[in-house]
Amino acid sequence: MVALLGAGAISLVFTLFLTPLFIKLFHRLQWGQFIRDDGPQSHHTKRGTATMGGIVIILASVIGYFAGHLLTWDGIRFDPVTPSGLLVVFMMVGLGFVGFLDDYLKTRKQQSLGLGGWQKIAGQVIVATVFAVLAITLRDPVSGLTPASTAISLFRDLPLDFMALGAVIGTGLFIVWICLIVASASNGVNVADGLDGLAAGASIFSIGSYVIIGFWQFNQSCDSVSSYQNEYRCYEVASPLDLAIIAASIVGALIGFLWWNTSPAQIFMGDTGSLGLGGALAALAILSRTELLLVFIGGLFVIVAGSVVLQRAYFKITKGKRIFLMSPLHHHFELKGWAEVTVVVRFWIIAGLLVAAGVGTFYLEWITQ
């Protein structure tokens, strides 16, 4: 508990008080946001706002995570970091680096296109593939479990194990499955990062849910004396408490960052932040074995990304007609006359309700066993 609270508090203090220094640094480096001409006209005033704030979020999250563990020092030892926690860090940093390359090219060229679409996907696939291999290779030093399972999961593992098809085919399909989850989550957060504070606030709800889920799984783990030793009620998850700790560190970093990112934003997270956060969200879902629950927990990102897919598909099928005034969905409501802050707060409410539904069904599954 000390590590969990400490990680969140340290990362929050880091972003809350040090973000202004990074804003000045980014302006000096000329890392300013480029605004597309075909976007909402009201966004043109944001041109030049410091971007790549994801660097601050990721740095604070990593520092908070390790510092939280150091706080458990009792004069002899401290609670060590685990493969599960380090894998979340790896995913966040890895996809954050892909986003950084995209952001850097945008600021250098002063155009909306940094990395090409397929280049960005390739980066996500490389990071996700390494993550997938490590997640079924490494072992938790206490429980002996691998951080991830090769089975598809909802509230826990379902009887749908890729390895039932054989080691080679099963491993290949598992890697494809992980790449699909990672690409969907990271691009979902990326698409939602279009209004001041929208992605940061929604991510607080989504990633914050894994503080609750991880802590609950820790208390009800199959090797815990507090569990009923019932295979249908306990959770076989490697290091769930450490997943809660890294989730708390990310949430703390986001809360402090949101202070400066709320409208009118003084800094944007950029693709560095949105891809990194989406990667962390995917990693938390995979390692806590709640992958399909992401439909609820990341529900807002599903809706926003879905609006883009729907708009493009309808445009092609009807040869030029549109469902929305503009996609992603938040821009549609802006063009309908909603104030930016109104759109953001209402989307936060939707995100919160969907997360509550996800966590609620997670708990409901346990009490009905």
Curated annotation (Swiss-Prot):
GO terms for biological process: cell division; cell wall organization; peptidoglycan biosynthetic process; regulation of cell shape. The chain crosses the membrane at residues 3-23, 53-73, 81-101, 118-138, 162-182, 198-218, 240-260, 267-287, 290-310, 347-367. InterPro entries: Glycosyl_transferase_4 (IPR000715), PNAcMuramoyl-5peptid_Trfase (IPR003524), PNAcMuramoyl-5peptid_Trfase_CS (IPR018480). Disulfide bonds: none annotated. Its EC number is 2.7.8.13. Its cofactor is Mg(2+). PROSITE patterns: MRAY_2 (PS01348). It holds the Pfam family Glycos_transf_4. Its main location: membrane. It is found in: Cell membrane. It comes from the Bacteria. Pathway: Cell wall biogenesis; peptidoglycan biosynthesis. Keywords: Cell cycle, Cell division, Cell membrane, Cell shape, Cell wall biogenesis/degradation, Magnesium, Membrane, Metal-binding, Peptidoglycan synthesis, Transferase, Transmembrane, Transmembrane helix. It is a multi-pass membrane protein. Catalyzes the initial step of the lipid cycle reactions in the biosynthesis of the cell wall peptidoglycan: transfers peptidoglycan precursor phospho-MurNAc-pentapeptide from UDP-MurNAc-pentapeptide onto the lipid carrier undecaprenyl phosphate, yielding undecaprenyl-pyrophosphoryl-MurNAc-pentapeptide, known as lipid I. Belongs to the glycosyltransferase 4 family. MraY subfamily. NCBIfam families: mraY (TIGR00445). HAMAP family: MraY. This is Phospho-N-acetylmuramoyl-pentapeptide-transferase. It comes from Clavibacter sepedonicus (Clavibacter michiganensis subsp. sepedonicus). The lineage of its organism: Bacteria, Bacillati, Actinomycetota, Actinomycetes, Micrococcales. The gene is mraY.
